[in-house]
Amino acid sequence: MLSRVCPTLRYNRIWSAHAREMPRATLLLLQPNFFHSSPKTALVNRLDVTSSEFSSMFRRSFHALRSTVGDWRKLPKPPGQVFAERREYRKIRRRAPKKKQELELSVSICIEEQLPDDLEIQNIAEMLRLNVPMAMTLAFNGLKDSKYKTRETDIEDLGGYETVELSVMLCNDDFICKLNKEWRGEDHATDVLSMSQHVPELKLPVLMMGDLVISVETAARQAAERGHTLLDEIRILVIHGLLHLLGFDHEISDEAEQEMEEEEELLLKNLGWKGKGLIQSAYDIQKTTTVQPEKSDDRKEGDGLRLYKPKFSYIFCDMDGTLLNSKSQISEANAKALKEALLRGLKVVIATGKSRPGAIRILKTADLTGSDGIISESSPGVFVQGLLVYGRQGKEVYRGNLDRDVCRETCLYSLEHRIPLIAFSQDRCLTLFDHPLVDSLHTIYNEPKAEIISSVDQLIAEADIQKVIFMDTTEGVSSVIRPYWSEATGDRANVVQAQSDMLEIVPPGTSKGNGVKMLLNHLGVSPDEIMAIGDGENDIEMLQLASLGVALSNGAEKTKAVADVIGVSNDQDGVADAIYRYAF
């Protein structure tokens, strides 16, 4: 399992007939000149390539480079210094100091054609396109002042290179088994092969490191054994293979194994990637079981790729008090976790008391909107406490309206006591008078700016109302408004409190849980496939419905009482913590 192809095997990579190539990742878009030249030196003006063919699965070739030398033509000197001499001094133009060219890291990610067009594999390949250059940078930095005694030092000083090239291929067990047998004489699948292309004798400005070949099938089995995701395992294999290309080899001695293990653990820690290094993980497995190499001939014909899938298909997430912090902002950590969930194939659905425009407005700041985000006007979602449910292509699945008599009574109460009220009507917010708290619903909570309607009758006739919100102090809501309306509405409406300074009046039977249930029926998804995250009393039914309900620690006591687990608070990136802890 912990093996590699000997670094002295040199070959010309020909992936095109066997693989799909992802877009190349380039940290710095610098176009290197293949050869440097100056008037004081001979010019390399031609590059000839000769090849020596040998039998190979890839039809690889050894290459030798030879160059021919051309002479610089001497040009006549320009008629300079004429005016300078008349002024009896020479005018010298100082050359600007030559800027040090930064190293360009060029990474190709390939998917072997026999792998299925699986979304998870494609997402992992896209993650590697970003991750591998980061790992290379840290690994190169680790070579500086390195005290390792067993590492081959063919790759030492990177200052003489302009570009570093590396290719990573994801394949199945059959592919890597054939490669392993051909190059190493071992007829079994392995997890990663490191195939160097670096020739120290050739003084080129391009460091061609070679290829990392990773079996997704073997990686998936190891991920399941070790209790982490397929992406985590492939990242570990990338680190292991990269260190082999940099001259580490755990097979030559105990000291070499210890040095490579230390470097693996250090890189994984500095990158913030999960899991132990491959060497340490192998020893952990050996303590509990002895794993025999699996020969390709022993596998049943037709066995498909067995991936380590995420634990859930969907994540339903509340916004206020959950995804958003106490300043009604989404943190960078929460946004990053949601994006990674999407890359891993999970679908994220917003279930909130907010209107759809309000949710879109705030999530747009974190680049989470649109067709590749978690919310748009053409994506599923549960809004206004489950009273507006949108399904595929954003089409309305359900709309619930508040009783008109209840609407009228709440409006009259608002005018009489001068307590601000906001009525939600699909994508609009309506109110009867201007008030700072009404403005805060737009400026702080990002809801649509409330339209002031001149009379109660006009507001009732304006449109169907899904819910109304009273806004007051926390004490005013808890001691006056809530007790009054809990009794006044009877069975005509429900009283819901998502925020301590707001009270919502909604149609009877309204809950996010019902909205989520209707959306699941529309999508054909079982509640067993979902994880839900919330904090308020309006999230209770949703958390109870989900296979795993996570209440954040800042949530209501009633909500935490019904949750399966209690996470950290919304000001501590509770959503990100829950996703990394329970969803992956």
UniProtKB/Swiss-Prot annotation:
Query: What does the record note as the disruption phenotype of the gene behind this chain?
Result: Seedling lethality.
Task: List GO molecular-function terms, semicolon-separated.
Answer: metal ion binding; metalloendopeptidase activity; RNA endonuclease activity
The protein's location, in the record's own words, is: Plastid, Chloroplast stroma
Needed co-factor(s): Zn(2+)
Name the InterPro entries on file.
Answer: Cof (IPR000150), HAD-like_sf (IPR036412), HAD-SF_hydro_IIB (IPR006379), HAD_sf (IPR023214), MetalPrtase_cat_dom_sf_prd (IPR023091), YbeY (IPR002036), YbeY_CS (IPR020549)
- Mostly located where? plastid
What are the protein's UniProt keywords? Chloroplast, Endonuclease, Hydrolase, Metal-binding, Nuclease, Plastid, Ribosome biogenesis, rRNA processing, Transit peptide, Zinc
Q: Give the record's GO CC terms.
A: chloroplast; chloroplast stroma
Transit peptide region: 1-50
**Which residues does Zn(2+) bind?**
H240, H244, H250
For this protein, what does the record note about how its cofactor is bound?
Answer: Binds 1 zinc ion.
EC number(s) for this protein?
Answer: 3.1.-.-
**A Gene Ontology BP annotation from the UniProt entry:** chloroplast rRNA processing
Q: Name one Pfam family in it.
A: YbeY
Top EC group? hydrolase
Similarity comment text for this entry? Belongs to the endoribonuclease YbeY family.
Q: What does this protein do?
A: Endoribonuclease required for chloroplast ribosomal RNA (rRNA) processing and essential for normal growth and development. May be involved in maturation of both the 5' and 3' ends of 16S, 23S, and 4.5S rRNAs. Cleaves chloroplast rRNAs, mRNAs and tRNAs in vitro.
| Protein name in UniProt | Endoribonuclease YBEY, chloroplastic
- Annotated organism of origin: Arabidopsis thaliana (Mouse-ear cress)
